[in-house]
C-alpha cells in the first residue's frame, strides 16, 4: 500500500514548514515553483507539466483536486495546504480513514454550516469581490435548483484524504467527481468550499467526515497565516530549525518565552502622556 502526503506552494506567497514528526510509510512530497530553503522532511518536486501551464492559484487547485493523476501508483493520498504544519505521525489518522472505507475524508467547517452563509461571509470579507457577487448568487441558486439539500455536508478543505481506488470503478468515480469539481471552479467562483457540497451530492462519493476541525487544537496539524515578510520568514526559519535539530530548541524556546513574557507586553504598553 502506497500513501502520499503532499502539498503545493507558490514560494512568493506560501510558507513551507518542515513536518515535526515523520509518518513512516507515507511519502511526503512538496510541489513548488522553486526548491525551498531551510526546509527538511519533504521530497521536493517541480510542478507537473499540467500545473506549470496554470497561474499559481489554479496550479494549487489542480494539485489539490487530482492526486490520483499526479500519483498514479499511490493507493491513498493526504493533501494539506502549504501553511499547515504537520505536528505528528499521520498514520493513526490514515488508519481511521481506511477503516471507514470512504472515498474521501474531510473536516467540518469550523464556523459555518452551509454554502449560503459561506457566500455571504466571503462577500463581507472580500474573498468574493463585488464583480463576482452575481456569479456567486447564480452558483448557489444553481446548486439549490439541482437538488442540493438545504442541510448538506459543508467542509473546510485545507486537509483532504482520498482513496484512489486504482483500477476500480470507485477510482473512476472519484476522478469523475474531481473533474466535476474542477469544472465548477471554472464556471463559477474560485471558492472551492462553495462547490464541493454540490460535487459530493451529485457524485455520491462515500465521505468520512471527522467530528473535529484541524483549526481547533488537535494532535496532527497547526495552521499559520499566508502572509510573508522578513519577520515572518525569520519566524519560519526558526520553527523549521527547531523541529529539525534538538540543539535549536532551548535557545529558540527561550527567546520566544522572553518575547512573550517581557518584550511583547512592554511593546504593547501605551506610553504615558507628558504633563503640561
Name each region found by the language model:
Residues 1-276:
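Glycosyltransferase catalytic domains, chiefly GT-A lineage
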Amino acid at each position: 500500500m502506497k500513501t502520499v502526503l503532499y502539498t503545493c506552494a507558490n514560494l512568493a506567497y506560501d510558507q513551507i514548514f518542515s513536518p515535526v514528526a515523520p509518518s513512516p510509510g507515507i511519502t511526503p512530497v512538496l510541489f513548488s515553483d522553486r526548491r525551498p530553503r531551510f526546509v527538511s522532511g519533504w521530497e521536493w518536486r517541480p510542478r507537473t507539466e499540467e500545473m506549470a501551464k496554470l497561474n499559481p492559484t489554479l496550479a494549487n487547485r489542480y494539485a489539490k483536486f487530482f492526486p490520483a493523476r499526479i500519483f498514479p501508483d499511490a493507493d491513498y493520498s493526504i493533501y494539506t495546504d502549504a501553511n499547515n504544519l504537520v505536528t505528528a505521525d499521520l498514520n493513526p489518522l490514515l488508519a481511521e480513514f481506511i477503516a471507514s472505507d470512504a472515498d474521501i475524508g474531510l473536516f467540518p467547517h469550523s464556523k459555518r454550516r452551509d454554502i449560503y452563509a459561506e457566500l455571504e461571509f466571503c462577500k463581507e470579507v472580500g474573498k468574493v469581490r463585488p464583480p463576482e457577487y452575481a456569479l456567486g448568487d447564480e452558483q448557489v441558486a444553481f446548486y439549490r435548483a439541482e437538488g442540493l439539500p438545504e442541510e448538506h455536508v459543508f467542509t473546510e478543505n485545507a486537509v483532504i484524504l482520498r482513496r484512489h481506488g486504482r483500477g476500480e470503478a470507485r477510482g473512476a468515480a472519484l476522478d469523475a467527481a474531481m473533474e466535476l469539481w474542477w469544472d465548477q471552479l471554472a464556471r463559477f467562483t474560485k471558492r472551492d468550499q462553495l462547490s464541493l457540497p454540490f460535487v459530493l451530492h451529485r457524485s455520491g462519493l462515500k465521505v468520512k467526515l471527522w467530528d473535529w476541525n484541524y483549526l481547533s487544537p488537535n494532535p496532527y496539524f497547526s495552521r499559520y497565516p499566508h502572509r510573508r515578510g522578513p519577520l515572518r520568514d525569520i519566524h519560519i526559519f526558526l520553527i523549521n530549525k527547531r523541529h529539525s535539530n534538538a540543539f535549536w530548541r532551548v535557545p529558540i524556546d527561550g527567546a520566544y518565552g522572553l518575547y512573550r513574557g517581557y518584550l511583547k507586553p512592554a511593546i504593547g504598553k501605551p506610553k504615558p502622556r507628558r504633563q503640561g
